[in-house]
């Protein structure tokens, strides 16, 4: 199984390392022709406005949207969550707009306000997940069929909608592989 990782910006190498630790091949995606044959796609963190513009410039936005609408599992972390959201508060930036979610960018503050916290994520089991938040967004509101999987201070920080998964935090920056494993189970 090959999982694509959008390699425009952010911790794409760390996502690939997490996939490889689970015995799955992760491949860097920079052009639309590289999407062929992947079983899923990860959109890493970074700066969502920049990633969105690069996806337009490199002709990736529409092909990724088309594949996801056709059922390709897509997992967005931090900026990837912003790009998956239908609504981004105060922004008209390019986005995939696939998830019934309204997102606030950089909601927990600036880079200096980054933090780590143990989250209760029932779909991952009883043990808390140590989450790393860096200039993180949160989801202010969702509509069905989107479903909240984790919250922090009453803000949604992990959500699933069918073949789409998104986290406000960076699971690739920890040794805990449960979020990546959950995504792989979504793929089947």
Curated annotation (Swiss-Prot):
Transmembrane segments: none annotated. L-glutamine binds at residues 46-48, 105, 134-135. Pathway: Cofactor biosynthesis; pyridoxal 5'-phosphate biosynthesis. Pfam families: SNO. The keyword Hydrolase applies. The active site is at 78 (nucleophile), 170 (charge relay system), 172 (charge relay system). SUPFAM superfamilies: Class I glutamine amidotransferase-like. Keywords: Glutamine amidotransferase, Hydrolase, Lyase, Pyridoxal phosphate. This is Pyridoxal 5'-phosphate synthase subunit PdxT. It comes from Moorella thermoacetica (strain ATCC 39073 / JCM 9320). The gene is pdxT.
């Amino acid at each position: 199984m090959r999982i694509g990782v959008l390699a425009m910006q952010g911790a794409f190498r760390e996502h690939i390392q997490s996939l490889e630790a689970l015995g799955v091949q992760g491949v860097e995606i920079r052009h639309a022709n590289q999407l062929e044959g992947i079983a899923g796609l990860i959109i890493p963190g970074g700066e969502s406005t920049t990633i969105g513009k690069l996806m337009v410039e490199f002709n990736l936005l529409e092909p990724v949207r088309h594949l996801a609408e056709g059922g390709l599992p897509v997992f967005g972390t931090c900026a990837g969550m912003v790009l998956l959201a239908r609504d981004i508060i105060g922004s008209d930036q390019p986005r995939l707009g696939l998830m019934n979610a309204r997102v606030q960018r950089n909601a927990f503050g600036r880079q200096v306000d980054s933090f780590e916290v143990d989250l209760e994520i029932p779909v991952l089991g009883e043990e808390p997940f140590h989450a790393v938040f860096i200039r993180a967004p949160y989801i202010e509101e969702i509509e069905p069929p989107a479903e909240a999987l984790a919250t922090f201070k009453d803000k949604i920080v992990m959500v699933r909608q069918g073949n789409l998964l998104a986290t406000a935090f960076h699971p690739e920056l920890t040794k805990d592989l449960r979020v990546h494993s959950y995504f792989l189970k979504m793929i089947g």
